[in-house]
Amino acid sequence: MVSTTTFLMLTSLATLTSARSHLTVTIGSNCTLKGPQGGHVFWWRIYDNGWFTKPCDQPGRFFCNGRDLTIINVTANDKGFYYGTDYKSSLDYNIIVLPSTTPAPRTTTFSSSSVANNTISNPTFAALLKRTVNNSTTSHTTISTSTISIIAAVTIGISILVFTITYYACCYRKDKHKGDPLLRFDI
């Protein structure tokens, strides 16, 4: 039973961490973590020992605007896991901090704009931006990864229970069939 519980916990943890976004930042830079598109986002920092804090309660180190979290002047102590939720959806981040002498990994930016930025007037650009933000909200029909991992863990646990009960029922017969074959007098 202990091995079943351990397997169940490891499976659910593997499912949870597979959906986590990994970000690599250098010391001294600023890092912005985007929150879910819903309402006001609450941010948590989770330490390796299980402790957690609210980074938005530390105004000198972090900046929160209601949705996004910005880590100001990243240090080696800022590495770890950050969790943002609006209690309808959530996002996980794993921050990996590199020394400032290590070059940051290359990032490629793609642009599909066919109009030069200086040809669009400010009101038109603001209207397009507002329409884009309104159209990019997440659907309420999507299922979060933590929900999927919980469902997977429960399904695995129930299947292990069914297997154990079936094994017990098939391998252990009633007492009248358990007799020693040398003491039977059936000829």
UniProtKB/Swiss-Prot annotation:
It comes from the Viruses. Disulfide bonds: none annotated. Pfam families: Adeno_E3_CR1, Adeno_E3_CR2. Coiled coil: none annotated. Keywords: Early protein, Glycoprotein. Glycans are attached at residues 30, 73, 117, 134-135. The keyword Glycoprotein applies. Belongs to the adenoviridae E3_20 family. This is Early E3 20.6 kDa glycoprotein. The lineage of its organism: Viruses, Varidnaviria, Bamfordvirae, Preplasmiviricota, Tectiliviricetes.
